[in-house]
C-alpha cells in the first residue's frame, strides 16, 4: 500500500518544501513547458573561445535553457553558483539576489540537488575563467522528492545501477554516451544497408513453431485462438519467405527472445539484425560484415584501433578466415578432415575429456564440441570461422566439395561470437530431411531442436534463389565498440532477478 511508504528525513524535508510551494500557488508540476532557445552543449561550443572582457562587451541575446541541479554553492548571502546538466553537457549558473529579486532568490535558495530548473540569462566568464550564465530568471520546473546518490561515490550497488537506470543516467554522462552510441550504431547500420538497396521489414514476434535457431523459447498463450505460441528465437524463416516472394535484399532489426541463462554476455531478450541477400553466398557476407563493422566503428570512434578488455583490435585489417577443422587441428592436433565413424569420434572425445550428450552423438556435433572447448577462447583478432558440420547447421547449404560441412561462418573476436551466416539452404527436399533430423534430436533430449516447419518447406518448393543470410548481435557489437564489459551496460533496462 502507498500509505505504508517510509521516507527518510531528507525526503520528508523535500516533501515539505514542495507542500510550501503548493500553498504559495507555485506548484512546479503544473508547469506544462519551458521553451528553450539553445542547449548547454551549443552554448559551450559557441562561447568556448570568448574571454571575460569579450563577453562583457558583446551584445548578447537572452539565452533560455533548462537542466538538473548537480552542484550548489553559496557565495555569501546574496549570490550563489549552481551547476546544471542537460542531456549532452553542463554549465555553471551565477545567481544574484539583486538580479532576480528577493522573492525569487529566496525560492532559489530552497532548491535541492536533483531539481530541474529553467533559466534565462546572459553569458559571462567568472574571475576564475569559467564560462557561466548570469541569471535573470530561475524557475523550478520539477521538484526532486528523492535525493541523488553522492556525486563522487555514485551508485555503489551494481544491481541498483541496472534496476534504477534512470538514476545511473542522471549521475553518469559516460553511461548516457554509451546509449547514444548504441543509437548511432543502429542508425549507421540501417543507413548503410538502405543505401545498398536493401529493405527493412517487420516480421511476427509470436510464432506458432520454434525455428530459425537452436534455442529454448518462451511460451505464451493466445487466448482468442486457445493455443500456445512462442516468442521468436530468430527472424530467419519469415525473412527467407520474403526472398521466395521476390524481394532480393531484406533485413530486420528487432528483439529476439531466448529462455536461457543470464550472464555478462547473455540476456534473455536481446537485439539482433538479420539480413538476406539473393544471388549471393557466405563469402559475399564476409566482405559485407567487415564493411559493417568498420562503418559502425567510424560512427562512434575516431580510430580504427579499438580497445576491448585491455586488448587492442585493428578493425582496418582484413579479418582472418579459418576453417573450423583447421582450427581444431592447430590447437589440439586432432584431424577431423579424416573420415571417421561416430564410435571413433566418441573415443576422441573421451580421450580429450569432452562431454557428449545423447543427442550430440554424431561426428558433426563432436567436431563442434571440440571447437567450443579448445579453439573458441584462443581467437583474438577478428576471425571468420567457417565450415560448420551439417548436423549443427540445419538451415545452411552443404559445401559442394565436402557435404559433411556447410557453407556457414561465425565471426569471433576475443573469444566471443558476433555474427552467424550461411549460404542458405534452398533445396526443399534436403530441408525437409534436416527438419526430420531435428525432430529425431528432440526425441533424444535436445530441447533446442527446430520444429518441422512444413509451410517453410512448401515456400522453398516455390524456388528460392541462391541466398546469403547473416545475423549480427547488436548488443555485443555495441559492447565491443564502446568497451563495455557486460551486456547489461548496453541494455537500458536489462532483465534482473526479482528483488527478495
Curated annotation (Swiss-Prot):
It is found in: Cytoplasm. Binds 3 Mg(2+) ions per subunit. Keywords: Aminoacyl-tRNA synthetase, ATP-binding, Cytoplasm, Ligase, Magnesium, Metal-binding, Nucleotide-binding, Protein biosynthesis. One of its GO terms (cellular component) is cytosol. Mg(2+) 2 binds at residue 417. It catalyses: tRNA(Lys) + L-lysine + ATP = L-lysyl-tRNA(Lys) + AMP + diphosphate. Its cofactor is Mg(2+). Its main location: cytoplasm. GO terms for biological process: lysyl-tRNA aminoacylation. Its EC number is 6.1.1.6. PROSITE patterns: AA_TRNA_LIGASE_II (PS50862). Gene3D superfamilies: Bira Bifunctional Protein, Domain 2, Nucleic acid-binding proteins. It comes from the Bacteria. InterPro entries: Aa-tRNA-synt_II (IPR004364), aa-tRNA-synth_II (IPR006195), aa-tRNA-synth_II/BPL/LPL (IPR045864), Lys-tRNA-ligase_II (IPR002313), Lys-tRNA-ligase_II_N (IPR044136), Lys-tRNA-synth_II_C (IPR018149), NA-bd_OB-fold (IPR012340), NA-bd_OB_tRNA (IPR004365). Mg(2+) 1 binds at residues 410, 417. SUPFAM superfamilies: Class II aaRS and biotin synthetases, Nucleic acid-binding proteins. It is an enzyme of class 6 (ligase). GO terms for molecular function: ATP binding; lysine-tRNA ligase activity; magnesium ion binding; tRNA binding. Belongs to the class-II aminoacyl-tRNA synthetase family. PANTHER family: LYSINE--TRNA LIGASE, CHLOROPLASTIC_MITOCHONDRIAL, LYSYL-TRNA SYNTHETASE. NCBIfam families: lysS_bact (TIGR00499), PRK00484.1 (NF001756). Homodimer. HAMAP family: Lys_tRNA_synth_class2 (MF_00252). This is Lysine--tRNA ligase. It comes from Mycoplasma capricolum subsp. capricolum (strain California kid / ATCC 27343 / NCTC 10154). The lineage of its organism: Bacteria, Bacillati, Mycoplasmatota, Mollicutes, Mycoplasmataceae.
Amino acid at each position: 500500500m502507498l500509505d505504508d511508504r517510509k521516507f527518510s528525513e531528507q525526503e520528508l524535508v523535500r516533501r515539505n518544501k514542495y507542500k510550501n510551494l503548493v500553498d504559495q500557488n507555485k506548484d512546479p508540476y503544473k508547469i506544462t513547458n519551458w521553451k528553450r532557445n539553445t542547449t548547454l552543449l551549443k552554448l559551450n561550443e559557441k562561447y568556448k573561445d570568448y574571454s571575460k572582457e569579450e563577453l562583457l562587451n558583446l551584445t548578447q541575446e537572452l539565452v533560455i535553457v533548462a537542466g538538473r541541479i548537480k552542484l550548489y554553492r553559496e557565495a555569501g548571502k546574496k549570490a550563489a553558483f549552481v551547476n546544471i546538466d542537460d542531456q549532452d553537457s553542463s554549465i555553471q549558473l551565477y545567481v544574484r539576489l539583486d538580479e532576480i529579486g528577493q522573492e525569487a532568490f529566496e525560492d532559489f535558495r530552497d532548491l535541492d540537488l536533483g531539481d530541474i530548473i529553467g533559466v534565462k540569462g546572459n553569458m559571462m566568464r567568472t574571475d576564475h575563467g569559467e564560462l557561466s550564465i548570469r541569471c535573470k530568471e530561475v524557475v523550478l520546473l520539477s521538484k526532486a522528492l528523492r535525493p541523488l546518490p553522492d556525486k563522487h561515490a555514485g551508485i555503489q550497488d551494481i544491481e541498483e545501477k541496472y534496476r534504477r537506470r534512470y538514476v545511473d543516467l542522471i549521475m553518469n554522462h559516460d553511461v548516457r554516451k554509451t546509449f547514444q552510441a548504441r543509437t548511432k550504431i543502429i542508425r549507421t547500420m540501417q543507413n548503410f544497408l538502405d543505401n545498398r538497396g536493401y529493405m527493412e521489414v517487420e516480421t511476427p514476434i509470436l510464432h506458432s513453431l520454434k525455428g530459425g535457431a537452436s534455442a529454448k523459447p518462451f511460451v505464451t498463450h493466445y487466448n482468442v485462438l486457445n493455443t500456445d505460441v512462442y516468442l521468436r528465437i530468430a527472424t530467419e524463416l519469415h525473412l527467407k519467405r520474403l526472398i521466395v516472394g521476390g524481394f532480393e535484399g531484406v533485413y530486420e532489426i528487432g528483439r529476439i527472445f531466448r529462455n536461457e541463462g543470464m550472464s555478462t554476455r547473455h540476456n534473455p531478450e536481446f537485439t539482433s539484425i538479420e539480413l538476406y541477400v539473393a544471388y549471393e553466398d557466405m563469402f559475399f557476407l564476409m566482405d559485407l560484415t567487415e564493411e559493417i563493422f568498420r562503418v559502425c566503428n567510424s560512427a562512434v570512434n575516431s580510430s580504427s584501433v579499438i580497445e576491448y578488455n585491455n586488448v587492442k583490435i585493428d578493425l582496418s585489417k582484413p579479418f582472418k578466415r579459418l576453417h573450423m577443422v583447421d582450427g581444431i587441428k592447430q590447437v589440439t592436433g586432432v584431424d577431423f578432415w579424416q573420415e571417421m565413424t561416430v564410435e571413433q569420434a566418441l573415443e576422441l572425445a573421451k580421450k580429450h575429456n569432452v562431454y557428449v550428450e545423447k543427442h550430440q552423438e554424431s561426428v558433426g556435433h563432436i567436431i563442434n564440441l571440440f571447437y567450443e572447448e579448445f579453439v573458441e577462447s584462443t581467437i583474438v583478432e577478428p576471425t571468420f570461422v567457417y565450415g560448420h558440420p551439417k548436423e549443427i547447421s540445419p538451415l545452411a547449404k552443404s559445401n559442394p566439395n565436402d557435404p559433411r560441412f556447410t557453407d556457414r561462418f561465425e565471426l569471433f573476436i576475443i573469444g566471443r561470437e558476433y555474427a552467424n551466416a550461411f549460404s542458405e539452404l534452398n533445396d526443399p527436399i534436403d530441408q525437409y530431411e534436416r527438419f526430420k533430423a531435428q525432430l529425431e534430436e528432440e526425441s533424444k533430449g535436445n530441447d533446442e531442436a527446430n520444429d518441422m516447419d512444413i509451410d517453410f518447406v512448401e515456400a522453398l518448393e516455390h524456388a528460392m534463389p541462391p541466398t546469403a543470410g547473416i545475423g549480427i548481435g547488436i548488443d555485443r557489437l555495441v559492447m565491443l565498440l564502446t568497451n563495455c564489459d557486460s551486456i547489461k551496460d548496453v541494455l537500458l533496462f536489462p532483465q534482473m532477478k526479482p528483488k527478495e
